[in-house]
Amino acid sequence: MVNEKKMLPKRIILMRHGESAGNIDAGAYATTPDHKIPLTEEGRAQAREAGKKMRALISTQSGGACGENWRVYFYVSPYERTRTTLREVGKGFSRKRVIGVREECRIREQDFGNFQVEERMRVVKETRERFGRFFYRFPEGESAADVYDRVSSFLESMWRDVDMNRHQVDPSSELNLVIVSHGLTSRVFLTKWFKWTVAEFERLNNFGNCEFRVMELGASGEYTFAIHHSEEEMLDWGMSKDMIDDQKDRVDGCRVTTSNDSCSLHLNEYFDLLDVTDDEE
């Protein structure tokens, strides 16, 4: 049974880490473990600026009885570059606004296979493009499908936190959940959340460094990008017209279907040769 009194987050904000040493020199992965790759000074500056922008967005867009009492709860990947990103982002907020943070291993980067020799990784990534980005498993590492499984587990835990008010949110406050993670992990999160297909996942472009995307609770009771982001932005992310239309429909509850479980696009893809009615009808 759904808890009628549970405090749904007003926003769920997905953010990629700032510029890292690995982003400017792929050779760094050959000598430094992926989880220890640091931010550059530019990455730190990006994170500080993103924190200011995030606070401004939340504070100016919050409204209603709970608007002035908005609070933020952070989930962060345990990698050095995400942890440092959060420290810099946090400088944009006061302690009053931040009610908690949890280091969460399940939102870490895709495992590309221990130390990554640049020449070998170039060949491996070319193979991935031919095989398919979602199902290709890196030697000694993970596929995006593996990441999907652990992100699915994280989502279940996150919603249990919401159901049981483990964030300890005052009912008079507006809750914002911020997930500081990685590019592929964030795209996988969205694929799980919106029940996108593998083909739709493979359309998506990566987040920029310290880019954050805002899912806000619409009047329909569903989360959508269309409140904070334009159609042009979503096109730049690689979303199709159908995916964008779905986001728009989530704002006010005008959706004809609730997921790709019953979407006519996907029904036609699998069952286009079926008769419209039973013979005996």
UniProtKB/Swiss-Prot annotation:
Record-annotated active site: 17 (tele-phosphohistidine intermediate), 109 (proton donor/acceptor)
One Pfam entry name: His_Phos_1
One GO MF term attached to the UniProt entry: catalytic activity
Biological role: May play a role in carbohydrates metabolism.
UniProt similarity note: Belongs to the phosphoglycerate mutase family.
Protein name: Phosphoglycerate mutase-like protein AT74H
Lineage summary: Eukaryota, Viridiplantae, Streptophyta, Embryophyta, Tracheophyta
